[in-house]
Amino acid sequence: MADTKYSQYVIRKPIDYGDKIYYDVGYYGPNVWYKGEDYKNDFTMIFIRVEESMIMEEYAHVHDFDMYLWLLPLEPNNMEDLGCEVELVFGSGDEKEKHILTKTGSFFVPKGIVHGPFTFRNVTKPVLLAHACTGAADYYKTEVFK
């Protein structure tokens, strides 16, 4: 499409299917990342199709930005049942709390809050992880414990 007055506000990115994309641990399924440079601001949005059980983030870590994690089943006739268990640990030491979602839901992680591991268990159908960072032109983390 030719450049027009508003074409700068339309962003097209291909899905990255990769052979198997290994980051810290485990396979992150087909995904697309929209970074601050795409929007010319400090907002990052990542969409990942999770297809198998894995530890997505193995270690506790923090961010200096707010993070939102939405989990949605990719089954059009049942938008409530995730078809898996998704666990996120908040806090560290004696303050650790494990929280588990088995239905459509979201985790909000304010900046500075220690969190992780982030685990997908018993995955029986694909799940969409929508991952947003506000105040961050890209996703990054500072590990707290290994």
Predicted regions mapped to residue ranges:
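A short beta-strand-loop-beta hairpin characteristic of the jelly-roll/cupin
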Residues: L71-T102, Y140-E143
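Short basic alpha-helical hairpin corresponding to helix-turn-helix/winged-helix-like nucleic-acid-binding
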Residues: M54-E57, H61-P73
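A short, N-terminal "cap"/entry segment at the start of jelly-roll beta-barrel domains
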Residues: M1-A60
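Conserved hydrophobic/aromatic beta-strand scaffold that supports enzyme active sites
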Residues: F47, L69, S106-F108
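Conserved metal-binding segment of the jelly-roll/cupin
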Residues: K98-R121
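Double-stranded beta-helix
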Residues: M1-P14, F118-K146
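Short, solvent-exposed aromatic-acidic interface loops
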Residues: L88-D94, F108, C133-G135
